[in-house]
Amino acid sequence: MNMGTRTELKRAIRKGAVQVNGEKITDPGFMVNENDEIIFAGEPVPYFRYEYYMLNKPAGVITATEDRYQKTVLDFFGERRRKDLSPVGRLDKDTVGLLLVTNDGGFHHRLLSPKKHIDKEYYARIDGRVDEADREKFEKGIYVDEIFTALPAKLMIDGYRENALESDFMDLANSRAPKSALENGVSEIRVVVQEGKFHQIKRMFHALGKEVIYLKRIRIGSIVLDHTLEEGTYRR
């Protein structure tokens, strides 16, 4: 049911288009609960306590609920969205792919708690050749810096191309990836981690002397990004 924007809905309420438990309501600020029967324009309105969305995040957008200066992932949901929606975890500004959005705090916790050991799988393009030695280092756990040593992770090497293309590069907002990949060639890989540290995948490859030039999250646990979703679109 399309009920319009918040402004349009308030106008409709004032005109008496909404009934709650059989009584006409004209105050847009009237509070309802999950047991109330709500009728809008003659049709029942179902109540959903929790909402869950899969968003295919594009590059150049920050993972936040609001920001005065930059576009956020919640801006894709428009004015009609529930005000208690928030992203589950985060993706870097220049990282694309699977992002879950919900108002279910328990769901947030189950996916993000380190104790749950939830897999997060990424597809990436790397400047230069990724080899078996790199895979073994990922498997053992990579020392990133004096503060962070990554837990063992699964690295899958899908292929290597000697001739990189401009289209191989993400919209690099804050990456250190050099354009030398146009000369060095590009490796296509997938990596599975169970952590979610700041810039983790980029930092792990940087510790091996390699740079990520494109990064896309494709799976969280058993939830796989719908390949039919265009970047910047979402579904329930």
Q: How should each PLM-predicted stretch be described?
A:
Residues 1-236:
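Basic, flexible Lys/Arg- and Gly-enriched helix-loop patches that mediate nucleic-acid binding at interfaces
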